[in-house]
Each structure stands twice: as C-alpha cells, then as structure tokens.
Amino acid sequence: MVASRAIGSLSRFSAFRILRSRGCICRSFTTSSALLTRTHINYGVKGDVAVIRINSPNSKVNTLNKEVQSEFIEVMNEIWANDQIRSAVLISSKPGCFVAGADINMLSSCTTPQEATRISQEGQRMFEKLEKSPKPVVAAISGSCLGGGLELAIACQYRIATKDRKTVLGVPEVLLGILPGAGGTQRLPKMVGVPAAFDMMLTGRNIRADRAKKMGLVDQLVEPLGPGIKSPEERTIEYLEEVAVNFAKGLADRKVSAKQSKGLVEKLTTYAMTVPFVRQQVYKTVEEKVKKQTKGLYPAPLKIIDAVKAGLEQGSDAGYLAESQKFGELALTKESKALMGLYNGQVLCKKNKFGAPQKNVQQLAILGAGLMGAGIAQVSVDKGLKTLLKDTTVTGLGRGQQQVFKGLNDKVKKKALTSFERDSIFSNLIGQLDYKGFEKADMVIEAVFEDLGVKHKVLKEVESVTPEHCIFASNTSALPINQIAAVSKRPEKVIGMHYFSPVDKMQLLEIITTDKTSKDTTASAVAVGLRQGKVIIVVKDGPGFYTTRCLAPMMSEVMRILQEGVDPKKLDALTTGFGFPVGAATLADEVGVDVAQHVAEDLGKAFGERFGGGSVELLKQMVSKGFLGRKSGKGFYIYQEGSKNKSLNSEMDNILANLRLPAKPEVSSDEDVQYRVITRFVNEAVLCLQEGILATPAEGDIGAVFGLGFPPCLGGPFRFVDLYGAQKVVDRLRKYESAYGTQFTPCQLLLDHANNSSKKFYQ
C-alpha cells in the first residue's frame, strides 16, 4: 500500500510549506481588538456565529505551525468566552486550499524523539479542546484538506465541503515516513470505520469530496458556482460560508444534528468491529499485506496499525499516547528523513528558477505520434495547451490520436473528468501529416526515432517553417543535444526535454541545456513542463545527460550478475527487497532490450571501462532473437497481453549459458549483489555532480527517484550517501574494485566526503 505508491504519490501532496508572517485584516465583520496583532487567523461575527478565517501570509497554502497553533488557541478562547457567540465556522481565505498540513520544518529541527513527541501532544491537546467545544464548530472545506488540516476538520462538530476537483481530503503522512500525529489515528477509525481509515492512512491517497461524503468524512456537499460579477472561486467560497453559517446556527439551535445516519453496510461493519475475533483478523490481514508490500523497508505503516490497535483495544488515552510516542520515533528515522528530503526536493523542482519567459508558449507542436509523442500531447492538451501532433503516416497519426483520447477517456471512467470535459480537452489537439500551422508554433518537441540523422533532418525542416522565436526541443534519452543542435541556424533555441514513459504517469521531466542554449529558452521549457504537471530537473548536456548516464552502469552490472548465474527472478527479488519498485531484470524488459543495447553501446564508447560489467553481446543476442522485452512479449520474461502475470523465458537459458561469466564468491552474496547494483548508480550520480552535469544534489535525488525508481526509502543517491555514510560507500566500492576493476573506482567527490565526515550533500 505504501512502497508501491511512494514514487507516484509524493507529488500529489503540497502538505507542508515554510510560512513567513505578515499582517492581514479581515474587514466585513464585527471584529475584536486583538485582530490587528494576528497574522494567520482572524475572525469576525455574523449574528451569533463567529467566522474564523485561516490565511497564512506570503504563501499559496495554509499550513499549521507554532504561530498558527498559538493564534488558533487564542481565537478559540475568545470565542468560548464571548456569550454573544453561540457557534463558529472555520474557513480558509485561500482559493484551492483549506489547510494543506503541518509545517514539515517543525520536525526537521527536532534532534530527539521526545521533541517530536511533544509536537504531536501539543496538536492532540489543541484538537481535543476543539472536539469538546461547548459551542459547535463547522469546518467549511474548499480545496486541499490534508494531514493536519484533515485532523483539524475531523475535530470539528460538522464538515461541509465544495464538490469540485480541487477539494480533496487525505492523510499523506505515511508518504513522509510518519503518521497522523494530532489525533488522526484515533478519530478516523471512529468516523469512517476501521477498514476505510486503514486504507486512508496506509496509502496516503486523496479522497474526493463526493467520496468523502459517502464515507462519512464529510457531512454535506456544496455545489461550486459559475462565473458572475466575481470569479467562480470567490462566489463559491461566499456560498460555502453562507451555508456553513446557517448550519452552525442550526447546530446551536439544535435544529440540525451533527450525527450522520449510517447505511446498512456501515452499520454491519461497525457491529462486526465490536467482535474481538473480527478485529484481530482485520489487524492480521492488514499487517500481512503491509509487510508484503513494504518488504520491511518503511516502518510507518506498522506503527500506524499499532496506534490504531492501542486506541481500539486499550481506550482513547492509550491510543493518543501510542500515537504521539510512535510519531516521535518515526520523525527521526532515516526513512522519514529520506522521504521528507524528497518532498522538499519536489517543492524546489516545481519552481521556475530561470524566471518568467519573455513569451509564453501558446501553440505547441509535436513531431512523432508514437508512444512518447502521443504521451507528451496528452499531458499538454490536458492542461489547455493548443497542440499540433504531426506524423508521417495516417496509421501512425491515428494510433497516436487514439492513445490521447483513450488516456482522457480513462479519466472519465474514473470520474475524474466528465464526457464534456474530455471532448473539450481533446479539441485542443490537431493531428496532421504536414507542417501546416507550424508558422504559429512557439515550441516544437520532437519525439522521432533515436537517430542523429533523422533528428537533423526534422530540425532543418522545422526551422524552415517556424518563426524565429520558436524553440526546438528534443525528447532524446541519450543523444547529446549539442550534436543535434550542430545543424541549427539558431542553436540558442535548441534544448533537450527528456520525458519518461508512460508520459502521463511518470512525473519527471529532465531538461538539458547546452552552452549555447539561452536562459529564456530554458525558462520557456521549464514553464511548459510545469504547466504539464511535471517535476523538473535541469542538467547540462553530455552523453546520457544525468538519468540515462546513471542507469547505464547500473544495468551493465545487472547484466554481469545475470551472466554470473543469478536467476532473473532472484535478482528482481533482491533489488525490490532493497527498495526498487521494479526488479532489475524486469526493468530491462520495461525499458526495452533494444534501447538498452543502443544506450550501452553509445555510452560505452563515450566512457570506456567505467561503463564495463556485463557483455553487450547478451543484449545483442536477445535483440537478434526478438526478445525486446514487454513490447515484444518476450525478454527475460514472457508476457501475456492483458495479464499482469509473467513467467521466465526459458529460451534465455542457452543465451545466458553461452555467455556465462565466473562468479566471484567473495562478492556474490545476496547483500553484495544488492550493493554492486546500488553503488554503481550512486558513484555515477556523484560524478555527475562533480563534473557539473548536475547543479544540485536535490535535483540528482529527484531525478533518480522519480525518473529511474531509485528506492524512495533511501531518499536518492545523495541522501543515501549522507545517511549511509560516504566512507562505507567508498569501502564497498573498493571491495568491488579489487574484484572487478575500474568500473567500481570511487570518484573524487565521493572520496572527499569519505575523508571528511563533516562534509555532507545536505547540511
């Protein structure tokens, strides 16, 4: 439930942000004199209802920190002491955000588990007071209500939410290696039932407002309003507030009840959970599933189960104590530090550090309607970008357009889009076989065959029909951008935009700049990527850039291990057991054996012995037999269309036997196999930083995890070196270097860190 979702899920949550304070004044209410001194929370009174507004200054989202906590307690004490106020509404002034969670930096500053435990206990006490409020409080939710934000909402007596796409509720703490620490593990099971609460807390998934209503997480929904004199968002917030105020009055007058009637299924589930045997079976089943999926690499899920069990079996006091103690324990684990580091890295990689481009890209064009081209088209039209999709054949173009439509239609099936919205989005796409309309293109992304001659040909054609300001971006995964730009008349407008497959699911976009690429071109490429919803790293040009360059030596070692006689299934088990979401042999099949051969040959020429390991002949023979991986139905495994099951390809036995290499017993234990794979990757990543291919360790970690599936629990290659220890990494490399040679020679920057224990990639 967690490890398999950790890569894809982290980016959905903006649960934590650093807050900077500045005063704000709430106007259209009767206000208290204390209002002028508050910066995050203010309130006014409508009749006998206090309307509490959350509005953290200088931030797009509201988050919970010590200042917010102090102001909230102050406001609630004033409301409780005021006899003229009989109820309250809690609402956000920010469009698209109720409260997005707690400030992650509060935990980063903790040096002991006890400090983190105190943070949890302070939150528990605050929300306990709210839960026991003598005056009913209605949470009016519009936008993200996550983590501590949801814990705040469920401590209120009533919850109303807008029924729109931006309103989501969830507890994503597990994706940061911690647990809901302000009462969430105790209140959620009582509110939505134990099974649903476990699902929310163990996956970190977002719940849409309509689903939340069915679960009992929300009591009432408010339909969003359309445009008027004010914007739809402003009108909807005003309407939400009006409805919430009326309900608060009704609760105070006892004309409406805060209790929601349960359906038959909910009643049966609630009754079943009163039986001790049933509860024990639920715990056992959930624990077994967690252990299977996390492989023991993520401690938070089991701690969540323990906290819930403590509350259900020993009472609320024991439950809250267990929650706060386990929160403290988790906050200082290596896994939590790794996952929080990834979150912070994502925040950095979702900003355009190159500034606003001189001209926004309004018309995009894509060359090649294959898997990648169609994928790029889908994520572009989905965000409102007018897109031309060009291919050389009617069949290819039709297949690409159908892929885009299917991707959008899948969202309709999941109720993420309506049919009308799908058709409206799809109308942004125009398919064609010629360059008609390219004279208006602001950017062209080529996704044609990985051949330098082909790319030169299309670049010349594009420059002959596009305006001077048009940017030419290549989706190549390995060909140096300066070689592609060699035939360009405007090399300052040429850049690399390396997407990952499947484009609509993989979050990373690797942007590659040459010495001639202008800053404005880079700013435009980043702006387009951000609009497409991507997490972006910007790297310097060179063979393999960053991601392919790190993957290649690792896969070379994988081939060597297979040639030494390790079974593909065992190798997959060893690598997933170390934290990779996809096993190494399966990864080769997914990438494509022909692609792996092409990259191995090209980068082998560029980097020589350092990229040694397995024999490229293994890949060549597989390609000659048609064993290209999943796309051909056969690789190291045999794949059945429409089935997730796969079996070993017995025809590989002869190929591997003929290319067998002697195993070296001193470096062939299961642990050594795991570290041979990981250290090849890590050493190359650090070398990329040393050579200036990477600008920052954070971008290196984000690229490795979100583009290549580096174990999230390790936080990326640079975080891994900091947490595991540079000296221990170097010791491993030296051990393997003595057995295999220079491909394991540690780079100088890694040696520098090993020689100085105070030297860290993250200070």
Curated annotation (Swiss-Prot):
<feature type="modified residue" description="N6-succinyllysine; alternate">
    <location>
        <position position="334"/>
    </location>
</feature>
<comment type="function">
    <text>Mitochondrial trifunctional enzyme catalyzes the last three of the four reactions of the mitochondrial beta-oxidation pathway. The mitochondrial beta-oxidation pathway is the major energy-producing process in tissues and is performed through four consecutive reactions breaking down fatty acids into acetyl-CoA. Among the enzymes involved in this pathway, the trifunctional enzyme exhibits specificity for long-chain fatty acids.</text>
</comment>
<dbReference type="GO" id="GO:0035965">
    <property type="term" value="P:cardiolipin acyl-chain remodeling"/>
</dbReference>
<feature type="modified residue" description="N6-succinyllysine; alternate">
    <location>
        <position position="644"/>
    </location>
</feature>
<feature type="modified residue" description="Phosphothreonine">
    <location>
        <position position="395"/>
    </location>
</feature>
<dbReference type="Pfam" id="PF00725">
    <property type="entry name" value="3HCDH"/>
</dbReference>
<dbReference type="GO" id="GO:0032868">
    <property type="term" value="P:response to insulin"/>
</dbReference>
<dbReference type="Pfam" id="PF02737">
    <property type="entry name" value="3HCDH_N"/>
</dbReference>
<dbReference type="InterPro" id="IPR050136">
    <property type="entry name" value="FA_oxidation_alpha_subunit"/>
</dbReference>
<feature type="modified residue" description="N6-succinyllysine; alternate">
    <location>
        <position position="60"/>
    </location>
</feature>
<feature type="modified residue" description="N6-succinyllysine">
    <location>
        <position position="440"/>
    </location>
</feature>
<feature type="modified residue" description="N6-acetyllysine; alternate">
    <location>
        <position position="46"/>
    </location>
</feature>
<feature type="modified residue" description="Phosphoserine">
    <location>
        <position position="231"/>
    </location>
</feature>
<feature type="modified residue" description="N6-succinyllysine; alternate">
    <location>
        <position position="460"/>
    </location>
</feature>
<dbReference type="InterPro" id="IPR006176">
    <property type="entry name" value="3-OHacyl-CoA_DH_NAD-bd"/>
</dbReference>
<keyword id="KW-0999">Mitochondrion inner membrane</keyword>
<feature type="modified residue" description="N6-acetyllysine; alternate">
    <location>
        <position position="436"/>
    </location>
</feature>
<feature type="modified residue" description="N6-acetyllysine; alternate">
    <location>
        <position position="519"/>
    </location>
</feature>
<feature type="modified residue" description="N6-acetyllysine; alternate">
    <location>
        <position position="60"/>
    </location>
</feature>
<feature type="modified residue" description="Phosphoserine">
    <location>
        <position position="647"/>
    </location>
</feature>
<dbReference type="Pfam" id="PF00378">
    <property type="entry name" value="ECH_1"/>
</dbReference>
<keyword id="KW-0456">Lyase</keyword>
<comment type="similarity">
    <text>In the central section; belongs to the 3-hydroxyacyl-CoA dehydrogenase family.</text>
</comment>
<feature type="site" description="Important for long-chain enoyl-CoA hydratase activity">
    <location>
        <position position="151"/>
    </location>
</feature>
<feature type="active site" description="For hydroxyacyl-coenzyme A dehydrogenase activity">
    <location>
        <position position="510"/>
    </location>
</feature>
<feature type="modified residue" description="N6-acetyllysine">
    <location>
        <position position="735"/>
    </location>
</feature>
<feature type="modified residue" description="N6-acetyllysine; alternate">
    <location>
        <position position="166"/>
    </location>
</feature>
<feature type="modified residue" description="N6-succinyllysine">
    <location>
        <position position="620"/>
    </location>
</feature>
<feature type="modified residue" description="Omega-N-methylarginine">
    <location>
        <position position="399"/>
    </location>
</feature>
<dbReference type="InterPro" id="IPR036291">
    <property type="entry name" value="NAD(P)-bd_dom_sf"/>
</dbReference>
<keyword id="KW-0808">Transferase</keyword>
<keyword id="KW-0443">Lipid metabolism</keyword>
<feature type="modified residue" description="N6-succinyllysine; alternate">
    <location>
        <position position="249"/>
    </location>
</feature>
<feature type="modified residue" description="N6-succinyllysine; alternate">
    <location>
        <position position="505"/>
    </location>
</feature>
<dbReference type="InterPro" id="IPR012803">
    <property type="entry name" value="Fa_ox_alpha_mit"/>
</dbReference>
<comment type="similarity">
    <text>In the N-terminal section; belongs to the enoyl-CoA hydratase/isomerase family.</text>
</comment>
<dbReference type="InterPro" id="IPR001753">
    <property type="entry name" value="Enoyl-CoA_hydra/iso"/>
</dbReference>
<dbReference type="GO" id="GO:0042645">
    <property type="term" value="C:mitochondrial nucleoid"/>
</dbReference>
<keyword id="KW-0520">NAD</keyword>
<feature type="modified residue" description="N6-succinyllysine; alternate">
    <location>
        <position position="166"/>
    </location>
</feature>
<keyword id="KW-0597">Phosphoprotein</keyword>
<feature type="modified residue" description="N6-succinyllysine; alternate">
    <location>
        <position position="519"/>
    </location>
</feature>
